[in-house]
């Protein structure tokens, strides 16, 4: 009987140890699941949803010679071996957007030129090209934060400006001067252009937040309002359209995006 009791005790000890080890492993796994669930719940609670899965280009369409996913990050790159002839865009396939907010983070090399395109049309003369509003981003931070309208009215607000855009008669090109729309009226200052530039990290991660409501278009970088447009040009403005990310023609460059969250 004593031998049987010892055997039972040993077996119970082994089972208890196994359960303890299983519990430890399970708690680590559950912790990771819980953390992911909490993050997802937080995103859902404030209405934002992820539109980039961090794994592949599912839900996006573009020239894969220039776009890829690497280490959970969306990468657009131009190399000496693979130059770019025209601006190209990675276009979100979730449909057209009207009023929305978009948050994310970007990092760009010094020679880089990129931007987040929104309320845009396909420019069918060039593959993967868009025409419309753009939250401008560049590696030297000369333009980062401004509102530039690709293939249309050009600059609608420089960094540090709150503007009202008025309609103009005649052809588009006749109403553009020094790469800015002649109907651009500065209504107030949001800050000195160079002081605002100092808030943007060179060749490092920055956050952006676009708040697009009706005819008011706001671009935030690192939580600071960089430009604001009230578009009164009922002839040329767009109230809905496509969303995309740009790689600009020019020297070799690399731009990275992550944590893209959309709220409609």
Regions found by a protein language model. Name each.
Residues 24-264:
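Carbohydrate-interacting regions of secretory-pathway proteins
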Residues 2-14:
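Bacterial N-terminal signal peptides that target proteins for export
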Residues 11-23:
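Bacterial N-terminal signal peptides
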